[in-house]
C-alpha cells in the first residue's frame, strides 16, 4: 500500500531519526506517527488533516504545519491550491473538501480533570506525621526526633525500625510522599520540617472530623530541657508565607464527630495509597457544626526572621538547653565496621558488657570508631559527649597514610568540634620501611591537631582502655552535674563550626554538646558537600598538601575560583609561584614553602 503523503512521511522520518540521537525517550512517539502516516493511502491537503490518524496529535501536526508553510514559501507554491489534483482521494464533494482543507481542524482541548487532594490512610505514617506537625504553631519547624516523638502514638507502624522482616520501610518513609505532594516543607541540614499552606489546609479540614488533629504543643515540649521559653522563630520558611493572627482565630465544634477512614478489611494500607475520601467530601460532613474558618491573615517578611539565626554576630536568640547528668545513662557506641566477625563481638561487646559492666551498643557511626552518648531517661534523647576514639592497627595506619584517608579523617575529627580525640594504635605486623612514616604521623597528630595517642599491645588491651575511659568520662560529667546542649533547630551544617567558635569565645570553660541525631547529620559523609569541602579535597590530591595545609589555604581562598582569580591578577609567573608562600603563612606544618607553592600554581594555573 502506497503512502498518500510521501512528503509528510519524509519529514516525520527525519524527526524520528533525530530523536534517536537527541531525545531517545520520544522515539516511540515518532515511530507510531511514522507507521500511521506510512499506512495511510489518503492524500491530505494540509498537515492538520493528519489529526484523524492514530498516533498523530496536535503537537506533531503543528510541527508539520510549520514545516509545510516553509516548504511552500521556499518553492513558491500557493498553500491553498497545492495538491488540488488529488481531491478525488479525499471526498466526492470537491467544493466542501476544499473549504474544509483550507481551515485547520479545530482541536478540542482536553478536559482538565480535577486533581484529587491527597488524604493519608488512618493511623498510617503520613497520617501521624501530619497530625504531629499540626500540633505545633503554624509554620513552626521540628526535627525528625521531635516529630517521631509526637507522631508515634497516632501510628500503628513503628518509626524506629521495620516491624516485619519483609518490610523495607518504616513509618518515617511516608515523609518523602508528603514532601513530594507539597504538604510538608523541608529545609536545612540537619533537616527541619513544617507544614506548607497546602498541608495546613488538609490538616484543617481533617481537624473538623478527627479530634487527633488539634493544636496542642510547641516544639519546646519535646526538647531535652523541657524548656517553655524555646524560641521557635529560629527557623522559618523562606521568602513570604501566610501567617494567621492568633487573636482572630476561633474554632467551635458543636458536637463530637468521629470518622475512621480505613479499608473494609481493617488491614493497614501503605502510606503511598490514597483513601477513597476526597477532602471536599470531608468538608460536606461538617455541615452540622458551627465552624469558623480563620480568615484574618497577614504577610510576614521572613527576611527579617533570617537575622534571628544564630551566627557570628548574633547569638541573642540561641537558647542553650540544660540537661541534668544525674538523669542520664552513658552509653559507649561502637562502630559496626569494628565488629567484623563473631570473634570481634566476643572480644569487644561481650567483654565490655560482661567483664567491665559498660553499657554499649553497635551502630553505624558517621565519625570515629567509638563514641560516648548520654541518654536522657525521661525524653530518650541522646547527647554526644566530648570524647571520641579512632582505633587503628599499624598496618591499617600505613594503608591510610598511603591513600590519604588518615589526613582526611583527622580533618573531619577536627571539624566535629569534639574536644577530646584519642587515637588508639594497636601493635600488628607491618612493613617496617614505614616505621619513620608512622613516627611522623603520630608526632604530627599530637603536636598539630592536639589529639591524644595511646599505644596498645592487642585488641584486649584496647577494650580495657575503652572501659577505663568510660569510667573516667562518667566521673568527669558527674562533677559538672549538667550538660549544655545546643538545640537541634539552631544547628546548620554550614554555620555549626563558627557557632561553636563563638560559644567558646563567650564561655571557654563550658563544653557545648549536640544531640546524636544532629551530630550524625552534620558530619555525614553522604551529605551534600560544600564548594569549600570539594576545594580542600582537590588540594589534598597534590602531593605535599596535608589536611592542615589544605585547610589553611581554604581559609585564605574559600573556593577554587578565589585562588584562580588571585593567580590571574598576578603580574608574573614568579609572583604566581610564590603566592601561597606569601599569603598562607601558618605555623609549623601549616606553612606553605616556596617549592610547594609553585607546585600548586603549576597544577591549578599551568603556563600555556
From Swiss-Prot:
<dbReference type="InterPro" id="IPR047416">
    <property type="entry name" value="XPF_nuclease_Mus81"/>
</dbReference>
<dbReference type="InterPro" id="IPR011335">
    <property type="entry name" value="Restrct_endonuc-II-like"/>
</dbReference>
<dbReference type="GO" id="GO:0008821">
    <property type="term" value="F:crossover junction DNA endonuclease activity"/>
</dbReference>
<dbReference type="InterPro" id="IPR006166">
    <property type="entry name" value="ERCC4_domain"/>
</dbReference>
<dbReference type="Pfam" id="PF02732">
    <property type="entry name" value="ERCC4"/>
</dbReference>
<dbReference type="InterPro" id="IPR042530">
    <property type="entry name" value="EME1/EME2_C"/>
</dbReference>
<keyword id="KW-0539">Nucleus</keyword>
<dbReference type="InterPro" id="IPR027421">
    <property type="entry name" value="DNA_pol_lamdba_lyase_dom_sf"/>
</dbReference>
<dbReference type="GO" id="GO:0033314">
    <property type="term" value="P:mitotic DNA replication checkpoint signaling"/>
</dbReference>
<dbReference type="GO" id="GO:0006302">
    <property type="term" value="P:double-strand break repair"/>
</dbReference>
<feature type="region of interest" description="Disordered">
    <location>
        <begin position="82"/>
        <end position="114"/>
    </location>
</feature>
<keyword id="KW-0469">Meiosis</keyword>
<feature type="domain" description="ERCC4">
    <location>
        <begin position="331"/>
        <end position="429"/>
    </location>
</feature>
<dbReference type="GO" id="GO:0046872">
    <property type="term" value="F:metal ion binding"/>
</dbReference>
<keyword id="KW-0234">DNA repair</keyword>
<comment type="similarity">
    <text>Belongs to the XPF family.</text>
</comment>
<keyword id="KW-0233">DNA recombination</keyword>
<dbReference type="GO" id="GO:0000712">
    <property type="term" value="P:resolution of meiotic recombination intermediates"/>
</dbReference>
<keyword id="KW-0378">Hydrolase</keyword>
<dbReference type="GO" id="GO:0031297">
    <property type="term" value="P:replication fork processing"/>
</dbReference>
<dbReference type="GO" id="GO:0003677">
    <property type="term" value="F:DNA binding"/>
</dbReference>
<dbReference type="Pfam" id="PF21136">
    <property type="entry name" value="MUS81-like_WH"/>
</dbReference>
<dbReference type="GO" id="GO:0048257">
    <property type="term" value="F:3'-flap endonuclease activity"/>
</dbReference>
<dbReference type="GO" id="GO:0007131">
    <property type="term" value="P:reciprocal meiotic recombination"/>
</dbReference>
<dbReference type="GO" id="GO:0048476">
    <property type="term" value="C:Holliday junction resolvase complex"/>
</dbReference>
<dbReference type="GO" id="GO:0000727">
    <property type="term" value="P:double-strand break repair via break-induced replication"/>
</dbReference>
<keyword id="KW-0255">Endonuclease</keyword>
<dbReference type="GO" id="GO:0006301">
    <property type="term" value="P:postreplication repair"/>
</dbReference>
<comment type="function">
    <text>Interacts with eme1 to form a DNA structure-specific endonuclease with substrate preference for branched DNA structures with a 5'-end at the branch nick. Typical substrates include 3'-flap structures, D-loops, replication forks and nicked Holliday junctions. May be required in mitosis for the processing of stalled or collapsed replication fork intermediates. May be required in meiosis for the repair of meiosis-specific double strand breaks subsequent to single-end invasion (SEI).</text>
</comment>
<dbReference type="InterPro" id="IPR033309">
    <property type="entry name" value="Mus81"/>
</dbReference>
<dbReference type="InterPro" id="IPR047417">
    <property type="entry name" value="WH_MUS81"/>
</dbReference>
<dbReference type="GO" id="GO:0005634">
    <property type="term" value="C:nucleus"/>
</dbReference>
<dbReference type="GO" id="GO:0000709">
    <property type="term" value="P:meiotic joint molecule formation"/>
</dbReference>
<keyword id="KW-0540">Nuclease</keyword>
<dbReference type="GO" id="GO:0031573">
    <property type="term" value="P:mitotic intra-S DNA damage checkpoint signaling"/>
</dbReference>
<dbReference type="GO" id="GO:0006308">
    <property type="term" value="P:DNA catabolic process"/>
</dbReference>
<keyword id="KW-0227">DNA damage</keyword>
<feature type="compositionally biased region" description="Polar residues">
    <location>
        <begin position="82"/>
        <end position="93"/>
    </location>
</feature>
<keyword id="KW-0479">Metal-binding</keyword>
<comment type="subunit">
    <text>Interacts with eme1. Associates with chromatin. Interacts with the FHA domain of cds1, and this may require prior phosphorylation of Thr-275.</text>
</comment>
<protein>
    <recommendedName>
        <fullName>Crossover junction endonuclease mus81</fullName>
        <ecNumber>3.1.22.-</ecNumber>
    </recommendedName>
</protein>
<keyword id="KW-0597">Phosphoprotein</keyword>
Amino acid at each position: 500500500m502506497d503512502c498518500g503523503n510521501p512528503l509528510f512521511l519524509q519529514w516525520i522520518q527525519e524527526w524520528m531519526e533525530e530523536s534517536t540521537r537527541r531525545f531517545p525517550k520520544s522515539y516511540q512517539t515518532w515511530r507510531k506517527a511514522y507507521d500511521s502516516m506510512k499506512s495511510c493511502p489518503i492524500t491530505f491537503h494540509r498537515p492538520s488533516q493528519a489529526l484523524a490518524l492514530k498516533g498523530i496529535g496536535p503537537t506533531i501536526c503543528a510541527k508539520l504545519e510549520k514545516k509545510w508553510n516553509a516548504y511552500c514559501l521556499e518553492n513558491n507554491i500557493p498553500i491553498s491550491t497545492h495538491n488540488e489534483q488529488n481531491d478525488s482521494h479525499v471526498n466526492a464533494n470537491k467544493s466542501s473538501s476544499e473549504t474544509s482543507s483550507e481551515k485547520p481542524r479545530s482541536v478540542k482541548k482536553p478536559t482538565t480533570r480535577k486533581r484529587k487532594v491527597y488524604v493519608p490512610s488512618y493511623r498510617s505514617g503520613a497520617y501521624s506525621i501530619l497530625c504531629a506537625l499540626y500540633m505545633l504553631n503554624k509554620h513552626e519547624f521540628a526535627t525528625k526526633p521531635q516529630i517521631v516523638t509526637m507522631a508515634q502514638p497516632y501510628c500503628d507502624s513503628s518509626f524506629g525500625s521495620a516491624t516485619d522482616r519483609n518490610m523495607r520501610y518504616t513509618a518515617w518513609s511516608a515523609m518523602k510522599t508528603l514532601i513530594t505532594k507539597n504538604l510538608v516543607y523541608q529545609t536545612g541540614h540537619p533537616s527541619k520540617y513544617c507544614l506548607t499552606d497546602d498541608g495546613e489546609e488538609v490538616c484543617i479540614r481533617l481537624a473538623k472530623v478527627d479530634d487527633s488533629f488539634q493544636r496542642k504543643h510547641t516544639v519546646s515540649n519535646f526538647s531535652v530541657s523541657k524548656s517553655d521559653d524555646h524560641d521557635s522563630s529560629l527557623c522559618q520558611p523562606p521568602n513570604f508565607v501566610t501567617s494567621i493572627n492568633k487573636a482572630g482565630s476561633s474554632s467551635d465544634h458543636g458536637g463530637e464527630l468521629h470518622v475512621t477512614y480505613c479499608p473494609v478489611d481493617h488491614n493497614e494500607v501503605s502510606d503511598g495509597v490514597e483513601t477513597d475520601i476526597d477532602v471536599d467530601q470531608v468538608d460536606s460532613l461538617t455541615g452540622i457544626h458551627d465552624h469558623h474558618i480563620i480568615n484574618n491573615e497577614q504577610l510576614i517578611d521572613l527576611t527579617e526572621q533570617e537575622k534571628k539565626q544564630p551566627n557570628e554576630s548574633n547569638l541573642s536568640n540561641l537558647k542553650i538547653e540544660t540537661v541534668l547528668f544525674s538523669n542520664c545513662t552513658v552509653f559507649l557506641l561502637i562502630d559496626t565496621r569494628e565488629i567484623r566477625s563473631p570473634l570481634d563481638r566476643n572480644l569487644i561487646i561481650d567483654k565490655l558488657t560482661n567483664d567491665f559492666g559498660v553499657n554499649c551498643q553497635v551502630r553505624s557511626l558517621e565519625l570515629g570508631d567509638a563514641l560516648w552518648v548520654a541518654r536522657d531517661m525521661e525524653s530518650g534523647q541522646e547527647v554526644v559527649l566530648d570524647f571520641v576514639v579512632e582505633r587503628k592497627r599499624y598496618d591499617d595506619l600505613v594503608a591510610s597514610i598511603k591513600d590519604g584517608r588518615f589526613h582526611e579523617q583527622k580533618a573531619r575529627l577536627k571539624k566535629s568540634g569534639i574536644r577530646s580525640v584519642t587515637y588508639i594504635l594497636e601493635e600488628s605486623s607491618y612493613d617496617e620501611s614505614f616505621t619513620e612514616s608512622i613516627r611522623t604521623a603520630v608526632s604530627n597528630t599530637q603536636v598539630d591537631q592536639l589529639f591524644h595517642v595511646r599505644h596498645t599491645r592487642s585488641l584486649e588491651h584496647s577494650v580495657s582502655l575503652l572501659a577505663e575511659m568510660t569510667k573516667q568520662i562518667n566521673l568527669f560529667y558527674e562533677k559538672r552535674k549538667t550538660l549544655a546542649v545546643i538545640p537541634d533547630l539552631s544547628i546548620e551544617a554550614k554555620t555549626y563550626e563558627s557557632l561553636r567558635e563563638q560559644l567558646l569565645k563567650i564561655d571557654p570553660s563550658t563544653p557545648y554538646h549536640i544531640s546524636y541525631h544532629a551530630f550524625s547529620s552534620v558530619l555525614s559523609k553522604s551529605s551534600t558537600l560544600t564548594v569549600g569541602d570539594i576545594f580542600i579535597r582537590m588540594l589534598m590530591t597534590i602531593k605535599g598538601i596535608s589536611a592542615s595545609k589544605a585547610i589553611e589555604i581554604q581559609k585564605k581562598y574559600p573556593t577554587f575560583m578565589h585562588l584562580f582569580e588571585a593567580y590571574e591578577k598576578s603580574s608574573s609567573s614568579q609572583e604566581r609561584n610564590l603566592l601561597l608562600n606569601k599569603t598562607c603563612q601558618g605555623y609549623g606544618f601549616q606553612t606553605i614553602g616556596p617549592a610547594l607553592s609553585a607546585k600548586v600554581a603549576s597544577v591549578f594555573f599551568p603556563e600555556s
